[in-house]
Amino acid sequence: MLPALYIFLIAVCILPTLPGLIGVIMAALGYMPALGLHHFSMQGFAQVFQWQGIGHSLGLTFFITLLSTYLACFFTFAILQSSWGTRWWRRIETALNPLLAIPHVAFAIGFAFLFAPTGMGMRALYALIDPTFNATSDTPLLIQDPYGLGLILVLALKETPFLLLMSISVLKQLNVKQTEQVAASLGYNRNQIWLKCVFPQWLSKLRFAIFAVIAYGVSVVDVAQIVGPTNPPTFAVLVWQWFNDPDLQLMPRAAAGAIVLFALGSLLLAVAFSIEWILTKGINQWLWSGRKAFRLPGKSVFVLLISLTALIIPLLTLWSVALRWRFPDLLPSRYSERFWQLEWSNILSTINVSVTIALISASIALVFAIVAHEYRIKYRWHIPNYIIAIPMLVPQLSLLFGLQVLTLYTNIHHYGVWVTWAHLFFVFPYVYLALDGVYRSYDQRLTQIGLSLGKSPLHVWLKIKLPQIASALLFAWVIGISVSLAQYLPTLMLGAGRISTLTTEAVALASGSDRRITAIYALCQALLPLCFFVFAYTINKKKAPTTEQVRSTHHELSYQ
């Protein structure tokens, strides 16, 4: 049974990667029989590099991705250095769930409402300085600025909680407490210990998570459309615009752009690996020469992160009920629930679609993740983690076009099924990795004891293992739901524009619709995954089974 499920998992979540890449390569080379293109050519690539401003767009994407990734790494390490093992860290761990729950799109819309030239930040500045003070400027500072500074800040702030989450298992493996004790006995203080002893190991073991952040940053479209530069846009947005060109004869250009985006992402991964090698092995004199170290403002960084995130919900709520809000008034002069009443029926149907797809894809992904981990434990041959994580490490546009072509060849027009499958394809790696730590830390001797009592593997799993990992399973399921709710490109491309979710509606409205309607959809998109995290937190408040409970379970099994 387990091998059959594992093969089915491979067929659904891993093998489609190959036709996805092959499909986009064939289209980039000009071979698309459905469009009457039967000959291979490099015209698509020529059209890409002939596009005016292509060099600027590529350079901008490279700069934004690299800077946002390492700014997030700096924020993460600063928070860890100042708080790991202290009371502060307990508060940070508690706050990680709501921070992770806020989707990128909702955060970006709230960020735009806060830092736009007529946003809450400028309104507060007017109120503090002088209501008659005139400091408005047509030059954007953080929202759609030409250098992408706002996009860098949004990506860095949103990826910091993810890197913190990934760092927990890394630091537990490193046994930081013992390292601190040994180094302290040699006369090093906490700052020196973390910089010279912990940082090199932490950076190396966090490589995979950093690669995932880079892959997301280089291919992000939804957030870049909201706060990113527009003339030229980032390269992923440019490729997305090419995919939406009504002239289908130009489709090879879009496919070639997706290949170039994949190459750019690969280059960034190589640069990240080189930076890691230089810091830890190449130019490593700083690790042992002298005792200079400095305290990073980790607590201040976390306060900034939690403050910005906490401002988003009330700000979106305020905009959703604002009937009249002139600039530079700090608060609306008139309030009304009119826009909620007008949009409520549409919102309910959109929420229904979003939640249905998220529940189905996350539940199947959870089952697949359990199957994959159980198979890895029982059998020597299994798919390596880096292959399972390919959807996380490859730009989405570089895969989705090929997957879209694959669905067209099947001649099945059930778009809801294809969208759910696309969500499952991208949700599964996150759920699998969320369970990786708990499966590796689980004591297999407990299972062996149960099997030695003559019980079936399924009976032992349900009675012994499941109670031990139930909290992690629930948390991984909720992560899968939040990842599904945040999917933008898979919904649009595999749904052919016929499936609307909160994310697709919020991005579409953020590009120029009424701020009040935009705020309503962004608020719903922010609160929905938060509700699931609150649900998981409430369930997990029940204590995990203690050692005595496990022993009593073994005793009970032995007499059944």
Language-model features, listed with the residues they occupy:
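Short, highly charged, low-complexity non-transmembrane loops/tails of multi-pass membrane proteins
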Residues: 184-186, 286-288, 451-453, 547-558
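Glycine-rich helix-loop "coupling/hinge" segments at transmembrane-helix boundaries
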Residues: 34, 38, 222-249, 328-333, ...
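Membrane-water interface segments at the C-terminal ends of transmembrane alpha-helices
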Residues: 2-33, 46-172, 205-222, 228, ...
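Short amphipathic alpha-helical coupling elements at transmembrane boundaries
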Residues: 43, 47, 93, 127-130, ...
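Short helix-to-coil transition segments within interhelical loops
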Residues: 172-177, 181-202, 448-469
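Membrane-interface capping segments at transmembrane-helix boundaries
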Residues: 174-177, 273-282, 442-445, 535-549
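Helix-loop-helix hairpin linking two adjacent transmembrane segments in secondary transporters
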Residues: 247-259
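Flexible interhelical linker loops that connect adjacent transmembrane helices
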Residues: 275-301
